Amino acid sequence: MSFKSTASKHQAQTTVSKLFANILPNHTIGNDEDKQEKLSSTQLLSNQLKQSSVPLKKVKKKTNAKIKKINDSNTKFKKFVKYNIIKSREEHTVEEQKYLKKLVKRNASQIKNLSHIDNMQIEEELSDVRASLIDKIGKKENKRLRKRKLTSAKNSKFDDFDNKVKRGFISVPGLTPGLAPIDYNESDSE
């Protein structure tokens, strides 16, 4: 069989030898040094690129991990600064209150997930925080009473409207005597 180049001849030989290696158990492919000498320049270049690409992946993973660590530390620092700025103010906007509630929920869930606390001081602080939260929750009951008063005021407005309709001060849309059917009696329908 005639080949146009040594590279195509080598490629055909390697495919045949790989085929025999898969079929025949004792067949060996040959020396790697002989293959290196018979390879064309493009094949040598592609082999070098394949070999160098493996460490590049590891380097990329390391750099990505470093970048991720830096970004995480930056976001933590920004959150800490934002919290300190909000904490220093006496009056908070609606967005700031939402942010603080979100922080409280997140921190409460993290504390709840802790299984055991070794340090006694931390445990005492945690119990103090729990007690203060319970006190704050107890104060919210007064707000609910105010809400009940508001709903009763709304109900009184509806009652006033009903009284005015009964007295005839306000008319309610519906059938008027001029629009009722001529032969219609209420006693007939019952």
Swiss-Prot record:
Subcellular location: Nucleus, Nucleolus
Record keywords: Nucleus, Transcription, Transcription regulation
Lineage top rank: taxon: Eukaryota
Keyword Nucleotide-binding: no
Protein task: Involved in ribosome biogenesis, probably through modulation of rDNA transcription.
Family the entry assigns: Belongs to the RRT14 family.
Name of the protein described by the UniProt record: Regulator of rDNA transcription 14
Native source organism of the sequence: Scheffersomyces stipitis (strain ATCC 58785 / CBS 6054 / NBRC 10063 / NRRL Y-11545) (Yeast)
Gene it is expressed from: RRT14
